[in-house]
Amino acid sequence: MPHTEHIWRNVDAVRRQAPLVHSITNFVVMNVTANALLAAGASPIMAHAREEMAELVNIVSSLVLNIGTLSAPWIDSMFLAGAAAHERGIPVVLDPVGAGASTLRTTTAAQLMERVRPAIVRGNGSEIMALAGAAGATRGVDSTRDAHAAADSARALSRRHHCVTVVSGPVDLVTDGDEEVLITGGHELMPRVTGMGCTATVLVAAHAAVAASPLEGAVSGMAAMSAAGSMAAERAAGPGSFAMHFIDALYALSEADIRARVRVGRP
């Protein structure tokens, strides 16, 4: 199981190596997630044109596929980039935003799992349950299920697709179908700011680019997210100032912060 030293090693490696993270992501969060990657020490690129997917995959360190604002051309680009990245051994992280809320979202996410075979999928409880085929309530892109409720679905998804599944919430669950890790930290202000889940996904992608395994990358990315959320909340007066302080916290994050603010353990 990844421990604090592994988490810090990956935080430091992201800062030293500046992995290039390619995000095919949604309009709502492009600026938010690009700034988060920069603050963490990674380098973002947000490109969607299918004509350049093959070229870009040759130079990136990891790939994020985020289905938040889907359209047919973007779906084509996701399949092209995802297949090329998988073939080259580049870690792909899928964010199935709103899976279960519409047929398009659910079907696209399921097809990406089958055809792209991402190394990691990160979603909230409702999204993971929907992707695993469980009956779960989804209200837009917001979760009505926590990690505990989605644990069986997460394990099943990981075993079926040979991937790491991350269920984010007040307590985050990371599993590869056999090993399970719980991450406790963060703050209740985090779901009051748009793009926090999508930010978790890009941080996981940055860490996956430098980590020893997808499981370790997922755990360390989520732990960094939780620690920064806790730090930001101490200075924030509300959601607006939290968003600003969160970026600063990612930039300033230290090993001592991780040790003091995040608990990583088994269920």
UniProtKB/Swiss-Prot annotation:
Question: What keyword terms does UniProt attach to this protein?
Answer: ATP-binding, Kinase, Magnesium, Metal-binding, Nucleotide-binding, Thiamine biosynthesis, Transferase
Q: Which residues form the signal peptide?
A: none
What CDD domains does the record point to?
A: THZ_kinase
User: Which SUPFAM superfamilies would you find in this protein's record?
Assistant: Ribokinase-like
Q: Which domain of life is it from?
A: Bacteria
- List the catalysed reactions: 5-(2-hydroxyethyl)-4-methylthiazole + ATP = 4-methyl-5-(2-phosphooxyethyl)-thiazole + ADP + H(+)
According to the UniProt record, what class of enzyme is this? Answer: transferase
Question: Which residues are listed for substrate binding in this entry?
Answer: 46, 195
The protein here is known as Hydroxyethylthiazole kinase
Per the UniProt record, the lineage of the source organism begins with: Bacteria, Pseudomonadati, Thermodesulfobacteriota, Desulfovibrionia, Desulfovibrionales
